[in-house]
């Protein structure tokens, strides 16, 4: 997140496989944290059940991969839209609970593996009635395109947190620029 987003007010939603973690910011301060027991695996399961296909095929279809399986596109859209609607209803309920629904000028920033689902950005915007965007990793320098994928945002965020705590002896974290390069090289080994 940018400082401007956190000052204006935004919600960061990390959509993982099993859970969704959200952090709401205003005036550069996190005002609410919530973890919800729903994730992108639920969408995969819905696709598998709805189209009567294997979980592997459902996952590939969910992520937009071209498969040999022929399926009705309209039915797939309905399945995905229904579960995304459930997800954003939960987020909306939380924002109502804290009095911030439709009141976050910087909107929702979506990260995590679930952020790669097609139409998620538009679904969030329509459901929450706030701006919506997919979070992007920015290293301030050259970074391999695969590492910009929002799947890596949590790992990336933890690394940045470690870097920012470099001089904090109470956490016992000492990260040098050599370690920073080692982390980048470690990420690169997972790239195709």
Locations of regions flagged by a protein language model:
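Helical "lid/coupling" subdomains associated with nucleotide-phosphate turnover
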Residues: 1-15, 21-192
